[in-house]
Amino acid sequence: MIITTWIVYILARKGAGLPFPPKVSSDVEVTETEAVSVVQHWLKKTEEEASQEIKEKMSTNFPPMQGQDVHVTRDVVKHHLSKSGLLANQSQEVLEERTRIQFIRWSHTRIFQVPSEARNEAMRDRIEQVRRSICHLSDEISQELRNRNSYSEC
């Protein structure tokens, strides 16, 4: 159904003399530097918020001696959390670790722009493939109808 709708849309545009795909693209161009800067900003903000929350939790559970600065590392946090019994909810820890891993994977992902020629060529290939499929199906249907008509005449 979806393929048929697209084919009708494409054929209607071609019949009206309009190009497919339209020459004016509504897509917003994304460059790698913009994406990287957004990810870095978000990561920095998240790390600052997490560090602040951890410092607050540690200061309420283990108040530092006067004049001591609180330095937060993953090892210290895990050590204090396991001692204080805050790791009762293991599923939350697993979820946070998975989220962290996914974020790291996503932050290392590169964003590449596909040249419009390659995109147009891929679109033409796909349209041609769909046309061949439709022609093949219509040939099969017409052959089947001929066979039914020949059987009904007998």
From Swiss-Prot:
The family database entries (InterPro entries) matched by this protein are listed as: SPATA19 (IPR028219)
Q: One biological-process term from Gene Ontology? A: sperm mitochondrion organization
Q: Which UniProt keywords apply?
A: Cell projection, Cilium, Developmental protein, Differentiation, Flagellum, Membrane, Mitochondrion, Mitochondrion outer membrane, Phosphoprotein, Spermatogenesis, Transit peptide
Per the UniProt record, the source organism is Bos taurus
Transit peptide, residues from-to: 1-24
Q: Which residues carry this modification: Phosphoserine?
A: S26, S116
| Main location per the UniProt record | mitochondrion
Its GO CC terms are:
mitochondrial outer membrane; sperm flagellum; sperm midpiece
In the UniProt record, the signal sequence range is none
Could you identify this protein by its name? Answer: Spermatogenesis-associated protein 19, mitochondrial
What does the protein in this record do? Essential for sperm motility and male fertility. Plays an important role in sperm motility by regulating the organization and function of the mitochondria and is also required for correct sperm midpiece assembly.
Compartments (UniProt record) = Mitochondrion outer membrane; Mitochondrion; Cell projection, Cilium, Flagellum
